[in-house]
Amino acid sequence: MVEHRLPAKVLAAPLHKHTREDEFSFILEGTVGAKFGDQEVSAGPGNLIFKPRGEWHTFWNAGETPARLLEIISPGGLEELFRRLDRLTEDLSPTEWEQLIAPYGCSADMKATMALVETHGLIF
């Protein structure tokens, strides 16, 4: 379980999917937007967003104030990828990104991510 603090209008991750884990976001403060599959939702404090394995998804702060949420990913193991991402010191190309996340059963769609950023006026 990881607590995320997202400034206003920040996208937490590119549109991605993982094949081994289910992901849950429990909203503590603020408003969080999420996309999973073809559906988009907006959730506030006390709401739980379920993002099942194998489905394209991402989430962002949909409000003008900071948001806080708990991310629960089960089963464990994906946290090693997060540690690697936290140690990055420069931006990755789409190809480098895919090479980094593929061993963890993950893939990302950067084109769809940038469309989402534009649609919602997000920072990524």
Identify the role of each PLM range:
Residues 16-18, 22-27, 41, 48:
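His/acidic/aromatic-lined binding-pocket segments of jelly-roll/cupin-type domains
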Residues 11, 18, 32, 80, ...:
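Hydrophobic small-molecule pocket/channel-lining residues, especially in calycin-type beta-barrels
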Residues 7-10, 46, 54, 64:
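Tight coil/turn sites that cap or link beta-strands
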Residues 33, 53-79:
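Ligand-binding loop in jelly-roll beta-barrel domains
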Residues 85-124:
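Acidic/histidine-enriched, glycine/proline-rich intrinsically disordered or flexible terminal extensions
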Residues 33, 38-56:
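Short acidic-glycine-tyrosine-enriched beta hairpin
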Residues 2, 28-29, 45:
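A cytosolic small-molecule/anion-sensing beta-strand core signal
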Residues 1-15, 21-22:
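A short glycine-rich, His/Asp/Glu-containing loop-to-beta-strand
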